Every structure is written in structure tokens, then in C-alpha cells.
Amino acid sequence: MATIKRLAIYDMDGTIVDSSHRYRTIVDANGERIDLDYWRENEYRAMQDGLLPMYEQYRSDLSDESCYVIIATARVMNAPDWQFVKEILGEPDYFISRTEGDSQSGKTLKINGLAKFFNLQNFKKADAVFYEDNVSYLKAVCDRFNIRGVYIPSKQGH
């Protein structure tokens, strides 16, 4: 295994994957948020998701032996999602996702999933970058691990 010089962490939806055709928001007393019922009703359409411009950087990082690539998504991954990852997106070195019934916040999910990497010797000197379209998640993860963040503007960052 090559020496790990870089750690690239990618959110999926709105960052490298365009799943907007099955995404919508609702507004309630707490503000605007993703309509999870609609999202779940349309999860079978994952193979119709598209790729966003940041995907080119993701593919470049996947081909770089000195870069360890992680996807950290708040999605519950089902068969169509995994098919999309395997056949279209390309599999990262590690994958963090929500399990069915998990209701913790996306930022907590991502922080807990990433914590072990920042304690491993292999990653101590790696230059880490987190690509995310949700400002709250981006700030929480970058502040927790003292890493660089790249905000990706999207309409899916709720």
C-alpha cells in the first residue's frame, strides 16, 4: 500500500451526485428540511441519478494511490444506491452511511464515522479535505478534526 498523503472525504448528494430528480424539501415550524418520505418513496430511482462537476475530482482522487477516498453520506444505502456506486460512481476506499432507523443528525453521523481515521497513524500526516454541500455539516466536521473544507453550492444541502 502506498503512503497516504491525502485524505479526500466526499458527501454524495449535491456534491458529486445529482439526485435532485428525487429530492424535495418541506417547510415546517423548524424551517426547511428534506422531505424524507418523498426521498424514500423514490429511492428505487437511484440509477437515474447523475454526476456533478466535482465527480471529476473524485475520480482523480480514486486513481491516486497516495489518496485515501471516503464517502460520508447521510443516505440510507439500499440496493439501487449500491448499484449506482458500483456501476457509475466508483467505489471509494471507505463508505460511511446511515443505517435504517438511525435518526442522529447527519453531522454527528459523519463525525462519528470519521473519528477513527484521525486517530490512526497512517492518517496523522495526511492532508485532509472535506467536500460538502451542507454548511452546518461542513463546519461541524472541519471544526472537529481541524481540516480544510470545500463548500459545494447545491439545492440539496438540507
What is each PLM-predicted segment?
Residues 22, 26-27, 95, 124, ...:
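Generic marker of "main functional regions" within proteins
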Residues 59-63, 118, 142:
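Surface-exposed amphipathic alpha-helices with a cationic face
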Residues 49, 55-56, 105-106, 113, ...:
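General structural signal for secondary-structure boundaries
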Residues 30-31, 50, 119-122, 146:
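Short, flexible coil/linker elements and helix-boundary hinge sites characteristic
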Residues 77-128, 137, 143:
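Substrate-recognition "cap/lid" segment bordering the active-site pocket of phosphatases
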Residues 2-104:
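Alpha-helical substrate-recognition element adjacent to the catalytic core
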Residues 125-158:
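Acidic, Mg2+-coordinating phosphoryl-transfer loop and its flanking beta/alpha structural elements
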